[in-house]
Amino acid sequence: MEQELRISQRAKRYPASGIRKMFDLAAQYPEAIKLTVGEPNFDTPQYIKDAAKRALDEGQTHYAPNAGTTELREAVAAKYRKQYWEGYTKDHVIITVGAMEGLFLAMMTLLDPGDEILVPDPCFPNYYGQASSIGARAVPVPTYEEYDYRIQAADIEKAVTPRTRAILLNSPCNPTGAVLTKEDILAIAKVAKTHDLWVLTDE
């Protein structure tokens, strides 16, 4: 008799992504315009390819520091100093394997089991799975056509409960393409400050 190996309840609860199902369906129609995954419609720039090849030739093929190489973290901090805040240093920067790892680490750091994180609805479905896998809950906040599907501070305010710990913003939003305005962000920041909430951004 064949024995069935046990898997965790967490794995059983993890919601399946509809994106891959749609991806497979769209593959049956060559003329379809695929909006299933957030992948650029252009090739990797040559200077990035050249840098990757150069790194291989120079033997940069071993474990890097957990937070990323010092040079890269310093370069990111310099860019952010120009764009956002002059106080950024490499100590504010962690290099992750894509945005999803970064968001997952942030959720693990900021949320306890039973906590809530507010997400725009519709949103990238992995947000629900990531929150669920650490025992937290992603709470959908509806977005509306009249605001071009940009999540609004007033709707976030309505969704806040005593268990709310964070707001997750996605701009440009996957899947709606909505881009938050400066006014949107300032209004959301006010709600976050009022309720002492963290704000995570997936950009």
Describe every region a protein language model picked out.
Residues E2, Q9-G98, L105:
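N-terminal small-domain helix-loop-helix segment of the aminotransferase-like
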Residues M22, Y127, I188:
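Aromatic/hydrophobic pocket-lining residues that form π-stacking "cages" and hydrophobic walls in ligand
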Residues Y29, I134, T194-H195:
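Helix C-cap/helix->beta junction micro-motif
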Residues G87-V93, P113-E116, R163:
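Short acidic capping loops at alpha-helix termini that bridge into adjacent secondary structure
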Residues T109-A131:
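Conserved PLP-anchoring active-site segment centered on the Schiff-base-forming lysine
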Residues S132-V139:
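A short helix-loop-beta submotif of the ANL/AMP-binding
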Residues V139, Y144-E203:
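Active-site phosphate-binding strand-loop segment of PLP-dependent enzymes
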